[in-house]
UniProtKB/Swiss-Prot annotation:
Domain named PRC barrel: residues: 98-170
Alphabetized SUPFAM superfamilies for the sequence: PRC-barrel domain, Translation proteins
Domain writeup: The PRC barrel domain binds ribosomal protein uS19.
Main location class: cytoplasm
Protein name: Ribosome maturation factor RimM
Origin species: Alkalilimnicola ehrlichii (strain ATCC BAA-1101 / DSM 17681 / MLHE-1)
Family to which the UniProt record says this protein belongs: Belongs to the RimM family.
GO biological process: ribosomal small subunit biogenesis; rRNA processing
Length: 170
């Protein structure tokens, strides 16, 4: 069984689909249907523990995704899964080229200017049409575009910090 640090959040169960226990899935992957390519899924329980779940089917449905799990054969059983995060083992993720990172690895990093001034911590990220955006929580919230080599000068996952070319007054 994987440890909690070995599971990377990749989506969430967001609703029910039909009467046979299928669920609607919101995917953080790009493209969104790539989450269906991962063979091992885990669900995060309310207590924070990740538990393995066997996905028996999954497909694109309209503008979203739907999935079925073993032993979940009706809406009542499927309802218990709504709101649970979907994670995959880190070992299943492909290696990324330099300058690209999984969001889960960036969340929680301490952010500093190139001059060493603290800006806060990366609380989360979101995607825009142009680029991803870091949301920093510190003395105030800051939104910083994630543009490697420009606003993002250095990422040190081992040290838990990210260096940004960013005016602390902005």
């Amino acid at each position: 069984m994987e440890g909690a640090d070995d599971i990377v959040p990749m989506g969430e169960v967001v609703g029910l689909h039909g009467v046979r226990g299928w669920v609607k899935v919101y995917s953080h992957t790009e493209p969104r249907e790539a989450i269906l390519d991962y063979p091992h899924w885990y669900l995060r329980r309310d207590d924070g523990d990740w538990v393995p779940v066997e996905r028996t089917a999954g497909r694109c449905q309209g503008k979203g995704l739907v999935a079925a799990f073993r032993d979940v054969e009706d809406r009542d059983r499927a309802r218990a899964y709504i709101g649970l995060q979907i994670g995959v083992p880190r070992r299943d993720l492909p290696e990324l080229p330099e300058g690209q990172y999984y969001w889960a690895d960036l969340e929680g990093l301490a952010a500093y200017t190139t001059g060493g001034e603290p800006l806060g911590r990366v609380s989360h990220l979101f995607a825009t049409g142009a680029n991803d955006v870091l949301v920093l929580q510190g003395d105030r919230e800051r939104l910083v575009p994630f543009v490697y080599g420009q606003t993002v000068r250095r990422v040190d996952l081992t040290a838990g910090r990210i260096e940004l070319d960013w005016d602390p007054d902005f």
